Every structure is written in C-alpha cells, then in structure tokens.
C-alpha cells in the first residue's frame, strides 16, 4: 500500500491511492510560523476589524489558523479563482469562479493565499479587489515561490520562501488530493 512519510516519526502512514511525499515543512514548523504571523497581524491591525479573504481552496487552512492566531475581531470571506485544469500547470489566464460576499469598500482587506508562484493569480485578485476601494489591501501567503515568479506582487506577510518544487498539504492539492495533510510535502512521483 502506498503511503506518505509522517513528519514526526519518519514512518509510512497509509493514505489510500497516494504515493510517497518528502516532507518539506512539518506541522510544527507551520504552526510556529503561522502563530508569529498572527501576532504580527494583530499588532498591525490593532483597533481595526480586518477582512481576511481566503483564496479557495488552497488557503482555507492557512486562513483559519491565521485568524485564530491573530485573536482579532475580524471577518472571514472567500473567493475562488482558477487557471488550472486537473494538471499542475496553469492552463490559461486566471478567472473568477466565486467572489467575496462582503463589501470591501473602506475595509482593511488581507488576502490569504496558500502559495504564490507566478504571481498571476494574486495580481489578478489585487486588481479586482483594489478597484472596489478598500482602505488597504495586502497579501499574506504561507508559501512564496520566488523562482517561479513571472509578475512581481507585493507580499506583506510571508510564511516561508521555498524553491520551485510542486508542493501539497495544509490546503494545497494535486488533483484534489493531499489537502488534509498537516504538513507541506513534495510528491516523490513528480
């Protein structure tokens, strides 16, 4: 049976239909860094009620943990943008699948992204949300893939800078798999 390498014991853990993963960032490393980012955000938005917008589906776990770590009075919202098919490479320009429900005008908006690679999706979202006149609009990303950058985008809060490897776990997927893993891993078969 195929499995994934668990980060804490180095043993194989069964995961139906999955190959092996090489752990890049452990659950403890992620939790520690997200807590630090949450404290920084709490300090930066003290006295404000920011709107945390997750880019679905990849940023859902990051947004939830970041919101808890900040301990702020805040609002959560979501949007979905896609440029991917079932493959791991972009298939075209980003397109909005579902929009935020909140009115962002005059609000402090913090866009939560799981990974920023080419920068195209984040640039597209920043343009779309920026046209609605928020009081401020900044990006928090768990992972920053600088080697893949095609468009420069401003990133205010960065969890980790990583290489160009395709990664999964902690909300990030490969063909809708691996999102539920508590760590970030690199699929061995890729």
In which residue ranges do the predicted regions lie?
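PRPP-associated nucleotide enzymes
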Residues: 1-190
């Amino acid at each position: 049976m195929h499995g994934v390498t668990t980060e804490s014991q180095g043993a194989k853990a069964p995961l139906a239909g999955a190959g092996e993963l090489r752990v890049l960032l452990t659950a403890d490393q992620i939790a520690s860094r997200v807590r630090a980012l949450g404290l920084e955000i709490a300090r930066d938005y003290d006295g404000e009620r920011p709107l945390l917008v997750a880019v679905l589906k990849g940023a859902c776990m990051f947004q939830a943990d970041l919101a808890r770590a900040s301990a702020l009075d805040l609002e959560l919202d979501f949007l979905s943008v896609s440029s991917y098919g079932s493959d791991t490479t972009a298939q075209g320009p980003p397109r909005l699948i579902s929009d935020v429900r909140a009115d962002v005008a005059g609000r402090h908006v913090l866009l939560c992204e799981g990974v920023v690679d080419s920068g195209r999706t984040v640039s597209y979202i920043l343009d779309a949300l920026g046209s609605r006149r928020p009081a401020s609009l900044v990006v928090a990303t768990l992972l920053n893939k600088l080697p893949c950058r095609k468009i420069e985008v401003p990133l205010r809060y960065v969890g980790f800078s990583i290489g160009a490897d395709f990664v999964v776990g902690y909300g990030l997927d490969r063909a809708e798999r691996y999102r539920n893993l508590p760590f970030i891993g690199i699929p061995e078969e890729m």
